[in-house]
């Protein structure tokens, strides 16, 4: 089968279409004939040599895909060949065929295009896991999400809008802030012109937010902690702004704050199954009824994966970048 491969770590130019062996599903696996695959920041890091796949995972890029079930393992009874599905992957999405654990597969809603389905699993499940499961977001609470125009950010806005959670976001331009507000954010802070810590204090009358979802890391740590309400939770899912920072632990102790690091890719199949189950239990009706959908920025053919990576690296995108495969 055809897939995007690279012989050595490097910039976007190392990506090329190559022939690789067709993957075979295990007893609890589903094989998908891929129609579309989402592009995520982790793909760029892996291409650069900084984020290797977990043991046993495909070395092919791609943490989510959508398409039609092509084959199922002997112990899979809940999903049938021929069904349209979207799946969370540990790797392998940039290919004509991909294998996913059955527990990480969701049926594609009738109204979704292939591009929307391919853009959905990784970012919506990341936002759900970290805001709703780990940080306990619920109606009446307030959260801050950095990178409101990213795939995770736009997904978080959609989930919070559906759950009546007040959501503030940061974004890097007036235009992105406007689009975040159009999606349903309660406040959008242009981090290039505004101090998000001060904005949070003003908008919460000094209380702070109950949870923060952050992909920046070190550069934002002190200001994130200062922006939390009593017993608030900071969930860090990336380190784009550095991995090291100094922090006054007295503030954590005095305000009983939690700082948690979180990833999705390396979790066990059992963990991912439970995350999908919990997501569908909480938001399945909204998904089926068309109240949840990803914001798709752009769609590139598979052979232009390098251009898709350049688009993401530029920071100009709003929402998800998708590869059209089938």
Regions found by a protein language model. Give the residues of each.
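C-terminal capping/lid region of NAD(P)-dependent oxidoreductase domains
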Residues: 1-4, 289-298, 306-326
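Glycine-rich beta-strand-centered segment in the early N-terminal region that forms part
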Residues: 21-38, 50-92
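NAD(P)H dinucleotide-binding glycine-rich loop of Rossmann-like/cofactor-binding domains
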Residues: 45, 78, 84-147
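Short glycine-centered segments of the SAM/dcSAM-binding site in methyltransferase folds
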Residues: 84, 142, 166, 232-233, ...
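Mid-domain Rossmann-like dinucleotide-binding core that forms the NAD(H)/NADP(H) cofactor-binding site
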Residues: 119-193
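NAD(P)H cofactor-binding loop motif with strongest signal on the N-terminal glycine-rich segment
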Residues: 147-148, 216, 239
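Adenosine-nucleotide cofactor-binding segment
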Residues: 161-223, 272-275
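Glycine-rich phosphate-binding loop and adjacent beta-alpha segment
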Residues: 171, 219-291, 324-326
């Amino acid at each position: 089968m055809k897939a995007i491969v690279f012989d050595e770590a490097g910039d976007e130019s190392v990506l090329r279409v190559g022939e690789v062996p067709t993957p075979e599903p295990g007893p609890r696996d589903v094989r998908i004939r891929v129609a579309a695959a989402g592009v995520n920041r982790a793909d760029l890091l892996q291409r650069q040599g900084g984020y290797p796949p977990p043991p046993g995972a495909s070395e092919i890029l791609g943490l989510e895909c959508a398409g039609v079930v092509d084959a199922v393992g002997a112990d899979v009874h809940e999903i049938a060949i021929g069904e349209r599905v979207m799946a969370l992957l540990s790797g392998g999405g940039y290919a004509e065929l991909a294998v996913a654990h059955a527990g990480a597969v969701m049926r594609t809603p009738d109204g979704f295009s292939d591009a929307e389905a391919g853009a959905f699993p990784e970012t919506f499940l990341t936002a759900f896991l970290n805001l709703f499961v780990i940080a306990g977001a619920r109606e009446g609470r307030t959260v801050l999400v950095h990178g409101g125009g990213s795939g995770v950010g736009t997904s978080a806005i959609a989930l919070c809008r559906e759950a009546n959670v007040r959501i503030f976001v940061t974004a890097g331009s007036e235009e992105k802030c406007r689009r975040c507000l159009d999606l349903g954010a309660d406040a959008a802070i242009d981090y290039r012109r505004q101090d998000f810590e001060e904005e949070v204090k003003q908008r919460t009358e000094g209380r702070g937010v109950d949870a923060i979802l952050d992909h920046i890391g070190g550069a934002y740590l002190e200001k994130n902690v200062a922006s939390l309400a009593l017993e608030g939770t900071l969930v860090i899912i990336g380190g784009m702004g550095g991995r090291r920072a100094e922090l006054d632990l007295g503030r954590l102790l005095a305000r009983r704050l939690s700082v948690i690091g979180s990833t999705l890719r390396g979790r066990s199949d059992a963990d991912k199954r439970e995350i999908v189950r919990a997501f569908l239990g909480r938001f399945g009706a909204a998904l089926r009824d068309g109240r949840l959908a990803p914001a798709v920025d752009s769609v590139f053919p598979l052979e232009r994966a390098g251009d898709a990576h350049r688009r993401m690296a530029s920071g100009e995108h709003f929402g998800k970048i998708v590869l059209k495969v089938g």
